[in-house]
Amino acid sequence: MRNLLAGKWSEVFDEADVLSKMRLPGWIAAALFAAAGAQAVENDSLEKVWTADALHVPYRAIQTPGRIGQERLPLVVFLHGDWQDGENNESQLAGYGNGSLLLVDQAIHGNIPLVYVAPQTTHSYWPPDRVAAVVRDALGRYPIDPRRIYLTGISDGGSGVWDTLKTWPECFAAGVPMSGMTEAAGLAPIARVPLWVFHGAKDNDTDVETGYGGAMVGSRAIVRDLRAIGGEPRYTEYPTGMHPIWHHAYSTPELLPWLLNQRVGTACDFSHLPPPGFAPVTGLSRNR
């Protein structure tokens, strides 16, 4: 392991060594290592839901077992990539939710109660208002702790994580963008948001440094800029990784415990989002 960027937490490693190099408390390691080899979730076990608003955003949802009494649970929101756009409320779960359902596996094997939702967008971009609509709807249906809402996504979904956090940085407890990009401008509001960023150094779709070019930049540049203004994002870069590194990333044993340890100080009132005057981005494609 070696530092790639100046900062407190960067790593580059051989993907085959991921599990062996993690040092975790025994009970966490046992549960997560067991989960790494077993898929506990069938697509049909995730409820099909549509938001009860004008956007009518489709999403899939599951609550893992283990809730005690009136306990409020963390919410993990997964944003898919652009090739899974549509309205069938199914495509976003392809490839085991592009690996994101490994987090649900880990929760089930570790008896960790949480709510996982995987919305679907009709755009090749994730307008933040669609993300907010899903969170707002899920808060009304499931016993969610509004101080523990986490965003993760891959490819254009990773970019959607960046853009949603920029829009409402105070509302999400952490972000885990993978193979994503965003504009270099406007990073200051998210410098204090806990982040764990993943990217492949050989990504030939969304360049790790330059994104798609122009105003858009990739994960390495984003992390560097955040650290320059006082942010402390974690950053994992796979030296031989191409664009689809997310199965490796979601298999990282420390990821779920790290994520669930994050909280916002004061919960947002999602019933008031989007804020007055917010204009969602529509018709914007990030395809080259």
Positions of PLM-derived features:
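Gly/Ser-rich "nucleophile elbow"/oxyanion-hole loop immediately N-terminal to the catalytic nucleophile
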Residues: 66-71, 124-156, 166
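Alpha-helical scaffolding within the catalytic cores
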Residues: 94-107, 130-134, 178-188, 217-222
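Short, proline-enriched alpha-helix->beta-strand connector loops that line the catalytic pocket
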Residues: 112, 190-195
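Primarily recognizes the serine-hydrolase "nucleophile elbow" in alpha/beta-hydrolase
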Residues: 141, 147-191
